Amino acid sequence: MKNEGKLDIIRPFGPAIGSTNIPKTLIDKINNFIDEVIKDKNKSKKFDWGKYLAGQVTQEIRLPNEIIDGELLNFLRESTKAFVEGLTDKKVTKFQLISCWVVRQFQNEYNPIHWHNGHI
């Protein structure tokens, strides 16, 4: 994939937005996990994260540590670091991912305007 891992910072209407390409290996890993979850009622229930999220969608699936740890966590860490250091004079010395999930959204479902906890 072209420019994989490169972060661009854009400001199309005010606040800065980080734009990057997620490596295909990560997309495949996440998609394979989601495919596995949606085929299994017990896993669908176990990883259902919808009750904690703002969206009015069919499925919001929490990613477990075995999916996050390693390449995905490193990608998110490096992208966040590039974003923060690209906008400020601050050096990122610590990164903690609180939670990570996939929104599986279908026609006529919506995700309302909302805020996320945490600090960048």
Regions found by a protein language model. Give the residues of each.
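A short coil-to-beta-strand element that immediately follows conserved catalytic motifs
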Residues: D89-C100
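Non-heme Fe(II)/2-oxoglutarate
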Residues: M1-D89, Y110
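A generic structural micro-feature
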Residues: P12, V92-K94, H114-H119
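Catalytic core of non-heme Fe(II) oxygenases with the double-stranded beta-helix
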Residues: S99-I120
